Amino acid sequence: MAEVEETLKRIQSHKGVIGTMVVNAEGIPIRTTLDNSTTVQYAGLLHHLTMKAKSTVRDIDPQNDLTFLRIRSKKHEIMVAPDKEYLLIVIQNPCE
């Protein structure tokens, strides 16, 4: 678990990073650097979007799988790294 904490600290220390969170397979946040309401909102919506993206990738090619999801808007850039049991979500300023 110390390795996970160290990795999260390293990511959080990058310039422009607003917050990080780890979400379990049910979409429940288990680690976050953001406030509670923001965390719950992002976790639920991004979990749903990631599951849809995963399903779409598999529909196109059943041998393939989603490895990374990146969304860039005017305000933020959101990066999602899905794993079997967890999602790692990083939110940063897009201009950094």
Curated annotation (Swiss-Prot):
Species whose genome carries this gene: Homo sapiens (Human)
UniProt entry tagged with the keyword Cytoplasm: yes
GO terms under cellular component: centrosome; ciliary tip; cilium; cytoplasm; cytoplasmic dynein complex; microtubule
Compartments it resides in: Cytoplasm, Cytoskeleton
Single biological process term from Gene Ontology: microtubule-based movement
Keywords for the protein's UniProt record, in alphabetical order: Acetylation, Cytoplasm, Cytoskeleton, Dynein, Microtubule, Motor protein, Transport
Gene Ontology MF: a single term: dynein intermediate chain binding
Sequence positions bearing N-acetylalanine: 2
Family affiliation: Belongs to the GAMAD family.
Oligomer status and interactors: Homodimer. The cytoplasmic dynein 1 complex consists of two catalytic heavy chains (HCs) and a number of non-catalytic subunits presented by intermediate chains (ICs), light intermediate chains (LICs) and light chains (LCs); the composition seems to vary in respect to the IC, LIC and LC composition. The heavy chain homodimer serves as a scaffold for the probable homodimeric assembly of the respective non-catalytic subunits. The ICs and LICs bind directly to the HC dimer and the LCs assemble on the IC dimer. Interacts with DYNC1I1 and DYNC1I2. Self-associates. Interacts with DYNLRB1.
Protein name: Dynein light chain roadblock-type 2
Keyword Transit peptide among UniProt keywords: no
Lineage of origin: Eukaryota, Metazoa, Chordata, Craniata, Vertebrata
Tissue specificity of this protein: High expression in heart, brain, placenta, skeletal muscle, prostate and small intestine; moderate in kidney, pancreas, spleen, testis, ovary and colon; low in lung, liver, thymus and leukocyte.
InterPro entries linked: DYNLRB1/2, Roadblock/LAMTOR2_dom
A Pfam short name: Robl_LC7
Additional observations: Expression is significantly down-regulated in hepatocellular carcinoma (HCC) patients.
Primary role: Acts as one of several non-catalytic accessory components of the cytoplasmic dynein 1 complex that are thought to be involved in linking dynein to cargos and to adapter proteins that regulate dynein function. Cytoplasmic dynein 1 acts as a motor for the intracellular retrograde motility of vesicles and organelles along microtubules.
